[in-house]
Amino acid sequence: MFLLAGLGNPGEQYALSPHNLGFLVVDRLAEQFGIRVTRKDSKALIGLGEIDGHQVMLAKPQTFMNLSGESLAPLMEKHQIEISNLVVIYDELDLPWGALKIKPKGSAAGHNGMKSVIQWFKTSEIVRVRLGIHPGHPIRSGAEFVLAPIKRSQMKELDEFVGFAADAVRTITAEGVEKAMTKFNRRAPGLNNEEA
């Protein structure tokens, strides 16, 4: 079974903030495949189902971003899911808005949610889908920016971006990380795969 975990913060005030892109991608997958992500388990909302013939658990940790590992580690242990079948989806301020980068391993690169996950699992060999949120202009406070509502000017692109990310996650489960990286890693919207 795959555990597809979107990182974010619980609460309506954060629902459409850049920091909740991981939740939005999980919601999109849930909608596409008829999976209800409503069951509480290990400090997360989860839903079990199938994507392209693969058993999956969709999860949205409810611990707040910086404690995400506190939810995912017990969830994985309880359901005996291999770490190689964990995919973590989250926002990345180091990447421009609309960019997507799948990585099979690596550091948290300053992302506190991913840092928590790595600390709890004691390994950085965790597949992750990083979703670029940098607006392309200087920002005063990264912490304020990631928690503020997504700008109206970006809302039109948000639907496409979330759909693109959901397709990337789906491809990881169906075809593996390497193929997904080749197909989906991109610097910004509009670039073809060869340029990304």
Swiss-Prot record:
The lineage of its organism: Bacteria, Pseudomonadati, Acidobacteriota, Terriglobia, Bryobacterales. Transmembrane segments: none annotated. It comes from Solibacter usitatus (strain Ellin6076). Hydrolyzes ribosome-free peptidyl-tRNAs (with 1 or more amino acids incorporated), which drop off the ribosome during protein synthesis, or as a result of ribosome stalling. It is found in: Cytoplasm. TRNA binds at Y14, F64, N66, N112. The record marks D91 as: Stabilizes the basic form of H active site to accept a proton. The gene is pth. The active site is at H19 (proton acceptor). Monomer. Keywords: Cytoplasm, Hydrolase, RNA-binding, tRNA-binding. This is Peptidyl-tRNA hydrolase.
